[in-house]
Amino acid sequence: MERIVNHPILTIPQEGEHTFLFNGKPVTGMKGFTIAAALHQAGYPVHSHSVNGRNRSLNCGIGKCGACEMLVDGEVKRICITKVDNVKEVSEITVQNYTTDSQIEPREEPVEIYRTDVAIIGAGPAGLACRETLKELGLNSIVIDSNDKIGGQFLMQTHAFFFFEKERRFGGMRGFDIAKTLAGDDHSGIFLHSTVWDILQNKRIAVKDMLNHKNFYVEAQALIVATGAVPFMPTFENDDVPGVYTAAVVQKMMNAEFTLLGKNILTVGAGNIGYLTSYQLMQAGAKVKAILEAMPHEGGFPVQANRIRRLGIPIYTSHMLLKAIPNLDRTGITGAVVCECENFKPIPGTEKVIDGIDVINICTGLIPDNQLLTKGQYTFGKRCAGVGDAVRIGEGTTAVLRGKQAAYEIAQELAVRFNYNEYLQISKQYIDSHQHPIRIKEESPRPTPERQAQRPFVRLDCLYGFACNPCSFACPQKAITKSSTSVTPEINYEKCTGCMQCVSHCPGLAIFGYDTRKQNLFLPVE
């Protein structure tokens, strides 16, 4: 566990330091970052214990569970989202230090009620895309989010995103850059540090301002629920020991908190999340020993799997994790027991040990966080819509498009006139974004030998059709075209000048440049 000081993509901020006491011992953290990051950097991964005394650490890492709750200056707070700034003392919650006989006196406070057309719970890509479209349709909205920044999961994403667009906007941009643009310049009506704790009768939403410790209410004609998802953790022996983390924890700590939880990683799950977190771990200075996948084939996008192969990371299909091997004091792990499997059942006699690891990165999917959606549908009826991962787990592209689509649906329920063709177009794009990559070509096209000898050229290792076309915008000569999500990009080698702009703009790192005259090869390396 260490602080990341150099990164090929991210700019490491140089903030001041702040020292606080953890269980009576001084710990120094960086201002503007969480208590969880400070404790891990100081070598304290244990934050709580089970009822029978087992060491516990972070679980979701994004403020959606109570696994990291500790006493922070006498108040129960989640250390994964609580900054170290001005904190004096942090300690584990025990029966001894949390039992109190004091009575809490009720406070007389004026009731604050905000009224709007549409309330949006969640300031992630789906919620903010919905807000933008509602604004274009002439509807007011209030956005409520428990985090201190807008952007949701995009804030943790350093990779470039796939988008199929008619006009270039988000395609090829990195997640944290997209997060900065989603709300535009006008952030009015966005309430951060605010948690929705109930949806009441008469379409009233109860909210707590966690920063100022006060309650307020939002009354709206319609409701959008963009609450995202929570990580799914499979069960295996010692799945609760520190060193076993979900991808959300690994990614949040690495890309948002600049904290590397380990140097030698075993990833479980060969899907897009497994590929991307493994790739980002390598960028941050860790070594990924292997990726396990219980299915007999790889998941995710083939271009993402290929970028992993180019780094030399092996992908073992039909393999599952049986056990995490803890160290002597159970504050970390030293290895894992894996085996071959069939239909998600272990095959006896195939067990083997992968040693020399200090983190298991669990990338086995997400579960929609849809409790508020369920209650919202009871209260608002058809005027309640779910967007993003709250209704269907998908890519960031899908979340943005669903947010836009839902805005039109809510506008229709509120009898607001709009161009229906625009709604149909967005709906088609949303459906297309769910498309699993379909293999179109067997091998990458190449120019004729005569053209190869004339000037530099590129080849596309993009053999599958799916919703992505940033390469077509990257080419200044318009030599790359892609007519739909069901085809692969086509290169006009007569127009291609070999400028290599497309090599660095492909989100899947799937374009390679060649200059046979000078024997040069241009690789997509980040």
Report the location of each language-model feature.
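Residues forming the flavin
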Residues: 1-18, 30-526
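ABC transporter nucleotide-binding domain catalytic core, centered on the Walker B motif
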Residues: 23
